[in-house]
């Protein structure tokens, strides 16, 4: 008995000491955080607000994702990155503003740009490429340095005066165009004895094909090729113009790269130099010396004196580069409501458009009598039907006050991203916007064959027949199967009806370009799916004209993410890419199968993803 007491006492002492050590460690970490916060705040208070631009080189080294509206963190120390810049967000408008102003700024010696770590969809990338080309045409020297670029990265870098490739890099420059390869799992689910019950409305709604096929359908190939081929032509044209190539060279490089590489001993960097994709090969140290010799002094600087994009942005006062009218009248406000990312219920997060927060923003605009109209900015592949309906309901309530809503489509406004536009008086899209995908589907997995195979079963009693036939644990009943099918078809009809009413078309007319098929913005304009082609700025100007305003202010509500969600995103970002992909799939399945209420149907565009050798 004494030995047992001694053992318990020993364990208790160990636990007490461990607890003390753990608490001490937490205390030290907390004090370090407070100290860092203090020095950061004091540094911010005493640092000079004056940013010198004369005889400077502007260094643009964006690291992150291009989007319309950045997400801020709802936390006390939101300026601190815990695991580094894993969730960097670059607002397109601000980035373009820096490039356009820098191109016309005679004080700046040159622009240095490195887009290796910049991720942008093609409409945004084309805008950035155009801005760089315009700056170069204005006489500004642009030096692009890279350790390796794919198609979209090279599109932007090719607008520079000079492209320098890191000679020791193993990535090189490979503008091979767009490629779309999906994983197909039909046989996999059959082999593990899981029945994937798929209900799709729309012949071109290819999202669930990964569960029902072992290869890409002809309709999927057709829709994607018709969408992306003109985009690829536009990319090639701009790359060739930027580099001074004859027409057809980029296509030739992509089709014959294996031969071109063989001519240069299989060395990708030497191949890029030989065929003119880049101008020079340099190490980073050689680049530093080159920049000092070209733009700097002989002093021991790490690089010539320069300023960052963030510093340069702080010197620019106006929010919009191309203001045609003043936006200073607080009594005439235009609210820009962003729907960015996958549409889900709940709060806004990284790459998710949470309907709860979006509805809150719409209601803020509704309750503010100084807000004269809403410009809905959509950059979304769609998502949950219920969440999309929550957004349109809030917009309709805003419109019931007699104030208008105009939509501006960004890179993507597909499926549920179209659904949320169906109350708008006017819809704008970019030429290369990916839109359409008017269709819905639901996926219900049935694990009963697997459970039976391993020796598991469910049995019990129920007070009603429905209690038995609607219990998925017992397998997919005929009654439940029919209901899911009818539910999907009914939501599809509702979707088409909403579009038809908004576009002032017959139901049958909309069916011709619905069916889940994706369209480019210019084709959508020809079909009548959108009213006009243009940018967010054009949509705002259209709202100003509609309201007959002389002075106004266009503004956006902040998109805040809860600190817990931010920590979750950081934790996921440090995981290997393969694990991240698996978690995304599990998360998607969770939203489909374990969502609130009985919402099994989604309006999402799985077709909106592609690989461009980034």
Predicted regions and their residues:
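N-terminal Lys/Arg-rich, disordered targeting/topogenic segments
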Residues: 1-22
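Intrinsic disorder and flexible/low-complexity segments
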Residues: 2, 317-370, 487, 558-614
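Tryptophan-centric aromatic hotspots in well-structured domains and transmembrane helices
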Residues: 12, 419, 519-520
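Hydrophobic membrane-insertion alpha-helices, especially the h-region
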Residues: 23-41
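Aromatic-capped interface at the extracytoplasmic side
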Residues: 40-54
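Cleft-lining beta-strand/loop regions that shape enzyme active-site pockets
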Residues: 51, 56-182, 324-450
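Charged, glycine-interspersed solvent-exposed loop segments at helix/strand-loop junctions
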Residues: 186-292, 448, 452-527, 531-533, ...
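C-terminal long alpha-helix characteristic of the crotonase
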Residues: 241-242, 260-261, 279-330, 441, ...
């Amino acid at each position: 008995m004494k030995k047992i007491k001694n053992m318990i006492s020993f364990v208790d002492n160990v636990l007490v000491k461990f607890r003390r050590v753990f608490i001490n460690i937490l205390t030290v970490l907390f004090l370090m955080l407070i100290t860092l916060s203090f020095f950061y705040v004091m540094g911010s208070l005493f640092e000079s607000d004056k940013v010198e631009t004369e005889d400077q080189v502007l260094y643009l080294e964006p690291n992150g994702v291009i989007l319309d509206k950045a997400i801020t963190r709802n936390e006390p120390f939101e300026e601190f990155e815990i695991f580094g810049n894993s969730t960097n967000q670059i607002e397109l408008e601000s980035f373009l503003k820096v490039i356009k102003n820098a191109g016309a700024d005679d004080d700046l010696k040159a622009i240095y740009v490195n887009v290796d770590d910049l991720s942008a969809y093609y409409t945004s990338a084309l805008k950035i490429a155009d801005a760089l080309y315009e700056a170069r045409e204005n006489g500004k020297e642009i030096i692009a340095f890279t350790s390796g670029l794919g198609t979209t990265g090279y599109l932007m870098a090719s607008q520079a005066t000079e492209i320098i490739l890191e000679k020791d890099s193993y990535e090189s420059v490979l503008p091979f165009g767009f490629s779309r390869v999906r994983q197909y799992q039909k046989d996999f689910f059959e082999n593990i004895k899981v029945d994937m019950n798929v209900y799709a409305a729309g012949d071109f709604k290819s999202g669930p094909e990964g569960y029902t096929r072992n290869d890409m359908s002809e309709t999927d190939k057709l829709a994607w090729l018709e969408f992306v081929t003109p985009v690829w032509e536009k990319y090639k044209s701009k790359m060739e113009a930027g580099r001074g190539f004859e027409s057809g060279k980029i296509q030739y490089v992509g089709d014959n790269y294996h031969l071109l590489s063989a001519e240069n001993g299989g060395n990708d960097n030497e191949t890029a130099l030989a065929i003119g994709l880049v101008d020079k090969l340099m190490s980073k140290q050689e680049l530093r010396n080159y920049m000092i010799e070209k733009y700097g002094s002989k002093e021991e600087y790490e690089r010539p004196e320069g300023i960052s994009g963030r510093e340069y942005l702080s010197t620019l006062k106006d929010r919009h580069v191309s203001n045609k009218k003043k936006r200073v009248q607080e009594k005439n406000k235009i609210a820009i409501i962003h729907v960015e990312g996958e549409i889900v219920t709940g709060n806004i997060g990284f790459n998710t458009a949470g309907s709860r927060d979006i509805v809150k923003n719409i209601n803020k605009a509704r309750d503010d009598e100084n807000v004269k109209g809403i410009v809905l900015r959509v950059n979304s592949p769609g998502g949950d039907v219920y969440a999309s309906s929550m957004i349109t309901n809030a917009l309709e309530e805003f419109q019931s006050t007699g104030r208008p809503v105009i939509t501006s489509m960004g890179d993507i406004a597909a499926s549920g991203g179209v659904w949320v536009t169906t109350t708008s008086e006017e819809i704008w899209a970019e030429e290369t916007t990916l839109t359409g995908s008017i269709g819905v589907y639901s996926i219900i997995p049935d694990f009963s064959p697997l459970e039976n195979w391993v020796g598991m079963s469910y049995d019990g009693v129920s007070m009603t027949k429905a209690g038995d036939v609607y219990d998925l644990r017992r397998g997919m009943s005929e009654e439940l199967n029919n209901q899911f099918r009818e539910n999907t078809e009914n939501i599809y009809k509702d979707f088409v009806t909403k579009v038809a009413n908004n576009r002032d078309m017959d139901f049958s007319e909309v069916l011709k370009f619905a069916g889940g098929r994706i369209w480019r913005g210019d084709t959508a304009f020809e079909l009548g799916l959108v009213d006009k082609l243009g940018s967010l700025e054009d949509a705002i100007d259209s709202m100003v004209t509609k309201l007959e305003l002389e002075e106004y202010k266009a503004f956006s509500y902040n998109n805040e993410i809860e600190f817990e969600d931010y920590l979750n995103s950081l934790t996921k970002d440090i995981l290997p890419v393969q694990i991240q992909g698996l978690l995304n799939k599990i998360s998607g399945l969770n939203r489909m199968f374990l969502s609130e209420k009985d919402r099994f149907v989604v309006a999402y565009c799985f077709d909106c993803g592609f690989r461009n050798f980034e």
